[in-house]
């Protein structure tokens, strides 16, 4: 079973914006022990870059396709034709997507991806290393952002409780050369 935590995704995006003021995207690892969290972070980073493309008038088939995939995922395929029929201009649609994200997922930092306003092609060319803890063993990077995901009153961190979990945490914590950012719920972890 894989878990998601939208509050932590929002925090990751805000941290990425901060880190991009000092580092290049290739200097960043974004890690989580949960694949669902990693996939969602990748989607939201790509969406933010795609929204930059729209604002910078860099629309491309890849940007349009990425936005459509995102909308299909979160609005449902059956609602897409109505969405396009009812909305006016493309910028109104983008504005709607932003307010939808802010309301549904608490994504207040969805407006751009860093002050550098990276485009979707920048992100696809450079690619943040957004991956699970297991996949980066033996690798290091200047900045590591870790989203632990689990948040509950029972202090249940799932598989991270066991010996293997402690080893995974140790691997994740030791990958940063310069900056380590931990995103977690302190009462849980």
Question: Which residue stretches match the model-derived regions?
Answer:
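Core RecA-like ATPase module of SF1/SF2 helicases and allied nucleic-acid translocases
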Residues: 1-176, 180-181
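Short beta-alpha junction loops
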Residues: 184-189
């Amino acid at each position: 079973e894989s878990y998601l935590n939208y509050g932590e995704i929002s925090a990751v995006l805000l941290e990425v914006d901060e880190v991009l003021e000092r580092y290049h995207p290739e200097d960043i690892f974004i890690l989580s022990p949960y694949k669902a969290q990693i996939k969602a972070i990748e989607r939201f980073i790509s969406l933010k870059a795609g929204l930059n493309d729209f604002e910078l008038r860099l629309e491309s088939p890849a940007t349009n396709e990425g936005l459509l995939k995102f909308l299909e995922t979160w609005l449902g395929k059956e609602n897409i034709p109505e969405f396009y029929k009812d909305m006016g201009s493309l910028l109104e649609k983008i504005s709607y997507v932003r307010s939808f994200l802010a309301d549904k997922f608490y994504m207040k930092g969805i407006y751009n991806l860093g002050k550098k306003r990276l485009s979707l092609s920048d992100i696809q060319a450079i690619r943040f290393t957004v991956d699970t803890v297991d996949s980066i063993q033996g690798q290091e990077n200047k900045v590591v952002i870790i989203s632990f995901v689990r948040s509950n009153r029972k202090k249940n961190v799932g598989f991270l409780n066991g010996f293997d979990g402690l080893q995974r945490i140790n691997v994740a914590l030791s990958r940063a050369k310069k900056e380590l950012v931990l995103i977690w719920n302190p009462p849980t972890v």
